[in-house]
Amino acid sequence: NLSEWANFRSTGSVSGWSSLGGQTLNSYGRNLNPCGSSSGSAVAVKDGLVEVAIGTETNGSISCPASVNGIVGIKPTVGLVSRHGIVPISSTQDTAGPMTKSVALAAQVLSAISGFDPKDKATYNIPSTMTFNFADDLSLDGLKNKRLGLLVSGQEYEIGQKLLDKIKNTIAALGGEVVFIEDNREYPGNDEYFLLLYEFKYGIDKYLQSKKNLNVSSLDDLIKFNEANKDEVMQYFDQDIFYQSEEAS
């Protein structure tokens, strides 16, 4: 069960809730946020329902639920994995990626799902020299002389600082170096948010029109559907992002 419209219908969206499936719960507690639009995918992996899930991410929808549910999630570079058939938000940011319990399995899955797809132009940019053997570097010396950037988060708490230090020391012991990155910017920023609004309108219209036997063929149709069925689909939050996207175009 995934978040309604990938958390892109309302600024008041509830992660893990959909009008079809109800509320997805965080694996560690009923009162904790399952996070991200791929919340159900992360919980299914963590709780052992599946070995592998394929999440989708525009901005945090793989990394966040993977983080808070204690699994491994990878958001690949856009264009490495085909997005064909996936409900779009942003053609410049959307991608699919593996969600598993181990780095090794995540690397194997990424190798399997990566590659050229004539139905997704973003994959045209994959270098011809790409081997897709992402598991080949999973050795004890795989991090030797590698520099890894780590966004600093939670350092204001004692346990958070201890975990950051543990990450740094563990990677150093394996021959790598951690560079802590301070980033206080808000996401999405105004420019990025407008781009998301614009690309969503264009992308969702094209996606809906490519499907047969649907009663909706545009963002405007979706807005009208939600308004007509608000008691079911808008129980907890509205559709202000949909309105903004319609106006942005």
Name each model feature, range by range.
Residues 142-151, 197-249:
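Short helix-loop capping/hinge segments that flank enzyme active sites or metal/cofactor-binding pockets
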Residues 133-135, 159-183, 203-226:
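Acyltransferase
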Residues 49-52, 102, 146, 175:
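Loop/turn elements at helix/coil->beta-strand transitions in domains of secreted/extracellular proteins
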Residues 122-128, 181-194, 239-248:
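Flexible, acidic loop-helix segments that line cofactor/substrate-binding pockets
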Residues 42-46, 75, 104-111, 168, ...:
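Predominant activation on well-ordered alpha-helical scaffold segments within soluble catalytic domains
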Residues 1-96, 121-124, 151-153:
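Short glycine/serine-rich loop/turn segments
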Residues 11, 15-18, 22, 190-203:
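Charged, often glycine-rich, active-site loop that binds/positions anionic groups
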Residues 75-165, 228:
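A short helix-breaking turn/cap at a secondary-structure junction
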